[in-house]
């Protein structure tokens, strides 16, 4: 499972950088873990170069590389395994089946670990693969989806009734999200040429370990860039927290723990250097190794910190086909080259689109029951410790501390 968390972080950072480049000044919020786990269900049915490209983009080679566990009898029934043996690639088939089993077993274990403590926070994720009904999913593929992901693909009639299929998918998502997401697939997003779409929606709402005080009186200016100001409702907290400073990037990093095993990490540049968000250097420099270093106990120390962050709610919708293709996942979206023979004997499926929607509430949750009053934004008396004043764009990530898995990654650049 540790290897999978490394893979997910690598994928998260790469995906975020591609989205950030495509939308340099907009708010961003996504769940790389949720996207990766949903894509893994598709990956399980891929073969050939389609499989290789998906593994590379999703960083699954980081997981399968160390798979040395003995084969168990049920693994021998994996989709496509017997076909490979018949082609004379017996040793390769065993290694591939071992690696695949490790990937999907790790996702099952990771999901169990993340969902184990959801009594302290709300994490709702909806994942589903919808395929053209004429394709006929393999029974073995359906069984493995149920085994590893507690889900299964659903057949719909894209060919003859695309609009009806879209409404059916939206109705299913709306029901699963208790009405939070009523229209995940917009009009015109599917048609008679659609063969397979992947839907993924996730919502997070956590309770802070130490609640913020009630909202500060009045609105405060949020510096969108060096020239633009937007009024925003700020929240205040004075608490012992882990805080660090990234010297070469001139940025602070702060950990805000939620109740349970989840924390939010905020990365805040000292100042805005130009007319954009001021996050360009931070976004270009962030890597897996650097993030591990920045969030380590060696670089972060507990101190009594005064924290000012805006109250915000993000609800972001993405159609990820173009981004995933730019990352190297070409064949899966190509009608002529896609190989999903592990899903369907006819092998005429290709991925038309990946729809992802993520939502988060960041507020003073729990303050109504806490003693505390509002106040001014600076100049609190009797405090000589550091301040963390997020009155300009910042990056944030929500991490499951037990597994070090990034559940969400975001950029807040404009209220």
Swiss-Prot record:
**Keyword Secreted annotated:** yes
GO CC annotation: cornified envelope; cytoplasm; extracellular region; extracellular space; plasma membrane
Q: Give glycosylation sites per the record.
A: 75, 115, 339
UniProt GO BP: fibrinolysis; negative regulation of apoptotic process
User: Which UniProt keyword terms apply here?
Assistant: Cytoplasm, Disulfide bond, Glycoprotein, Plasminogen activation, Protease inhibitor, Secreted, Serine protease inhibitor, Signal
Q: Does the keyword Iron apply?
A: no
Marked site: Reactive bond: 380-381
Q: In this UniProt entry, which cysteines form S-S bonds? A: 5-405
As for subcellular location, the record says:
Cytoplasm; Secreted, Extracellular space
What Gene Ontology terms describe what this protein does at the molecular function level? serine-type endopeptidase inhibitor activity
- Domain of life, per lineage: Eukaryota
Could you state what the record's PTM comment says about this protein? The signal sequence is not cleaved.
- What is the protein's given name? Plasminogen activator inhibitor 2
According to its UniProt entry, this protein's organism is Homo sapiens (Human)
Lineage summary: Eukaryota, Metazoa, Chordata, Craniata, Vertebrata
